[in-house]
């Protein structure tokens, strides 16, 4: 009777397969991953994210929902949601350069929080640049991306208005905000 000896290659395969297995993520790892996902999505650095969390934690409503509402209300996010730019980074850039007006006044801070009935528009010098409008604004307006219910967009004038404050149901991205709250409440 012939018995087969395990070959050197089969031992290498099992050792290699073991290193490829995913390790189970710890609870802290899940919380950190969720926080990083939200920070990256909104383009916010840690210091400002923590500041928003402190504001959210002091409010009467659920801290996680309030945090997301505050992040949604940032001017750079609002300009992006109104489809006036292709990305939040581009929205941040045109805000810093003074190309966005809130209630007729230039605002240079992307972290500016919009309020109910605020009117957001592009500055006249941007509106006169048809290349930007054709390449960015009109293209985005025509691809069928919907403006959230908490905002109103006048496509003709390229102006938006805040109808109400955003709520959790307005955010379509799957976010487990309770993990972020657990992380910061330690």
Label the predicted regions.
Residues 89-93, 105-110:
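Short, surface-exposed recognition loops or helix-turn segments adjacent to catalytic cores
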Residues 85-88, 94-95, 114:
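Short, well-ordered loop/turn sites that connect or cap secondary structure elements
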């Amino acid at each position: 009777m012939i018995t087969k000896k395990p070959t050197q290659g089969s031992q290498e395969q099992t050792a290699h397969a073991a290193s490829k297995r995913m390790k189970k993520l710890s609870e802290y790892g899940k919380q950190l991953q969720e926080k990083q996902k939200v920070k990256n999505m909104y383009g916010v650095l840690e210091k400002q994210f923590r500041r928003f969390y402190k504001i959210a934690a002091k409010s009467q409503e659920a801290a996680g929902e309030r945090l997301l509402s505050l992040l949604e209300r940032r001017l750079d996010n609002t300009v992006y949601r109104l489809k006036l730019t292709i990305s939040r980074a581009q929205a941040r850039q045109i805000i810093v350069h003074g190309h966005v007006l809130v209630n007729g006044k230039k605002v240079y801070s992307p972290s500016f929080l919009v309020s109910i009935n605020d009117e957001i528009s592009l500055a006249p010098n941007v509106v006169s640049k048809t290349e930007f409008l054709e390449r960015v604004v009109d293209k985005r307006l025509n691809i069928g991306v919907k403006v959230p219910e908490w905002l109103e967009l006048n496509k003709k004038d390229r102006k938006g208005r805040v109808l109400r404050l955003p709520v959790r149901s307005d955010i379509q991205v799957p976010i487990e905000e309770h993990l972020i709250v657990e992380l910061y409440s330690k």
